[in-house]
From Swiss-Prot:
Residues 61-83, 140, 190-200, 378-384, 435-440, 498-506 are extracellular. Its main location: membrane. It is found in: Membrane. Residues 289-313 are annotated as: Disordered. The chain crosses the membrane at residues 40-60, 84-104, 119-139, 141-161, 169-189, 201-221, 357-377, 385-405, 414-434, 441-461, 475-497, 507-527. InterPro entries: MFS_dom, MFS_sugar_transport-like, MFS_trans_sf, Myo-inositol_Transporter, Sugar/inositol_transpt, Sugar_transporter_CS. Belongs to the major facilitator superfamily. Sugar transporter (TC 2.A.1.1) family. One of its GO terms (molecular function) is myo-inositol:proton symporter activity. This is Probable metabolite transport protein YDR387C. Keywords: Membrane, Sugar transport, Transmembrane, Transmembrane helix, Transport. GO terms for biological process: myo-inositol import across plasma membrane; transmembrane transport. It comes from Saccharomyces cerevisiae (strain ATCC 204508 / S288c) (Baker's yeast). Residues 1-39, 105-118, 162-168, 222-356, 406-413, 462-474, 528-555 are cytoplasmic. It is a multi-pass membrane protein.
Length: 555
């Protein structure tokens, strides 16, 4: 590894913290893990953000059906105004996705989620009591900010607090919470459709999960990786005891030592003059058998004294602290304090692929059905136009499970190439259904489209962050999320106006055109990375985009 590569790979500490998983204290990870009531409460509580994400993005379909002009002091509620109400959440989510990582790194994952839930509550109340269009749009913008932050922070938090044995399950649970939240919003809207001003109740109900999260906040620990990066050993130890209730003091302390070793190695590339425990930006809380205190950097002698006297927290501390000073490997500049902002060409190519695939995820029209399904099917004089949206959301929910169990086994590229073709067929059938007023054909074709979408396109673009080197993942995840929300906002802001201008059937043809473009994009530029290490993923983008690297190398 060259000096430039070393500086580039290790320059961003906090983006790497979230990736320190596989080599962190194997002893504690190998313990049998049994979910207790308290640990279940922690993990379920952490997924409340995903539930709110799904509910607040799905609820708008039922709201638009029950919202009346006089409710907002209007003479008429135009399609453009409906589009503004709908798309304002996506606009807010764009800004939320930008704020997510800075907030999570500065205040911690737990506090950031608490801030999100507070915003969810405030926005829910504001939207429920809104008497003007402007006030309602402001409420939707506010909830969008919370959605954008939680969409980024919840998976990060879960990946950092989950034991390796259940990490995949917990991340899956978050996806289930999102799609389940959308389904719940449709079901509740259907049950409340005969109630006057039901849209106010639909908005108000979104405050309940947020209140539940705040009520159990004291039982949810901070990410150990974040707290150790801040030098708070005492809090890290308490968090680990909550997350691993069967672990002994030895296992907990081993985990802490391994975390410190990993993080200190990373910091060597920024400033190797002092190990993590005595770096100038860290204030270490340290508890030994008789005392607890705050150790500031100048108190090096006191630190040495404490570590020598402490047997439970850190054994052989003098040798341990000396070991942390190990040389930066491969000639990296140990005293480098400058942050490198230049991205390598291969990183730029990888980021473009991720953003483009996310663009196609949204421009192919999925959220047009999610947001406006009730309006779409109300044109066909269906007794309950909220029943088709429930079927659509149920299809999305069920086939999301299919995606989670096939992406790694079949490969993302292979499943994308197959399901995008099915999406295209579904949209073409939608166009026929609209053109001939065949509601049954329309419903079947939408279900086909949504099933294919949920099987790959709904999930795969979010995994493109794995194309990026560790020190660019936070930035790359924000870019990919921003692409999602901006394209989402564009589709939701123009859909009703478009169908009024060129008709439903032609709008479906436009979506079908973009799915064809997406297929060619995947075929020529989206590589398969199944089973590749981080270094090998980088090689895929070394000279252009080698989409056949896996097959040429391993088959």
């Amino acid at each position: 590894m060259s000096t430039d590569e070393s500086e580039d790979v290790y320059s961003d500490l906090y983006s790497i913290i979230s990736q320190v998983t596989s080599n962190t204290a194997n002893d504690i990870e190998q313990l049998p893990y049994a979910l207790t009531f308290k640990t279940s409460l922690i993990f379920v509580g952490a997924t409340i953000g995903g539930l709110l994400f799904g509910y607040d993005t799905g609820v708008i379909s039922g709201v638009l059906l029950s919202l009346k002009p006089e409710d907002l002091s209007l003479v008429v509620l135009t399609d453009v105004q409906k589009e503004l109400i709908t798309s304002s959440t996506s606009v807010g989510s764009f800004f939320g996705s930008i704020l997510a990582f800075p907030l999570a790194d500065r205040y911690g994952r737990r506090i950031t989620l608490a801030i999100c839930c507070s915003i969810f509550i405030l926005a829910a109340i504001g939207m429920a009591i809104a008497r003007t269009l402007t006030f309602l749009i402001c409420g939707r913008l506010l909830v969008g900010i919370a959605v954008g932050v939680s969409a980024q922070c919840v998976p990060l938090f879960l990946s950092e607090i989950s034991p390796s044995r259940i990490r995949g399950f917990m991340l899956t649970l978050n996806i289930i919470a999102i799609t389940g939240g959308q389904l719940v919003s449709y079901v509740i809207a259907s049950l409340m459709k005969e109630i006057d001003n039901s849209w106010r109740y639909l908005f108000a109900l979104s405050a309940i999960p947020a209140i539940l999260f705040l009520s159990i906040l004291d039982f949810i620990p901070e990410s150990p990786r974040w707290s150790i990066s801040k030098g708070d050993i005492l809090y890290t130890r308490d968090s680990l005891r909550m997350l691993y209730p069967t672990a002994s003091t030895y296992h907990v302390n081993s985990k802490i030592k391994q975390l410190i070793i990993e993080l200190d190695k990373l910091r060597l590339y920024e400033d190797a003059s002092e190990p993590l425990l005595v770096q100038s930006q860290s204030v270490i809380r340290y508890m030994d058998s008789s005392t607890s205190g705050t150790l500031s950097p100048p108190n090096i002698k006191r630190l040495s004294s404490n570590t020598e006297r402490t047997s439970n927290t850190m054994s052989s501390s003098s040798a341990y602290l000396s070991a942390l000073r190990g040389p930066a490997p491969n000639g990296a500049l140990a005293s480098n304090k400058k942050k490198r902002h230049r991205m390598e060409p291969r990183t730029i190519r990888a980021l473009i692929v991720g953003c483009m695939l996310m663009f196609f995820q949204q421009i192919t029209g999925f959220n047009a059905f999610m947001y406006y399904a009730a309006i779409i099917f109300s044109k066909f004089n269906i007794k309950n136009p909220l029943l088709p949206p429930i079927l659509i959301a149920s299809t999305n929910f069920i086939f999301t499970f299919f995606a989670m169990y096939t992406m790694d086994s079949l490969g993302r590229r292979a499943i994308l190439l197959r399901t995008i073709l099915i999406m295209t067929v579904g949209l073409l059938l939608c166009s026929v259904g609209f053109g001939h007023d065949q509601v049954n054909l329309l419903l079947i074709s939408v279900v086909i489209y949504v099933a294919a979408y949920a099987s790959a396109m709904g999930s795969v673009p979010w995994t493109c962050v794995e194309f990026l080197p560790l020190n660019r993942r936070s930035f790359g995840a924000s870019c990919i999320a921003c692409t999602n929300w901006l394209t989402n906002a564009f589709v939701s802001m123009t859909y009703l106006s478009t169908i009024n201008t060129i008709g439903d059937e032609n709008t479906m043809l436009i979506f079908a055109f973009f799915t064809v473009c997406a297929w060619f994009f995947v075929y020529f530029w989206y590589p398969e990375v199944k089973g590749l290490s981080l270094e090998e993923v980088g090689r895929v983008f070394d000279n252009g985009i080698d989409v056949h690297y896996v097959f040429r190398t391993y088959h």
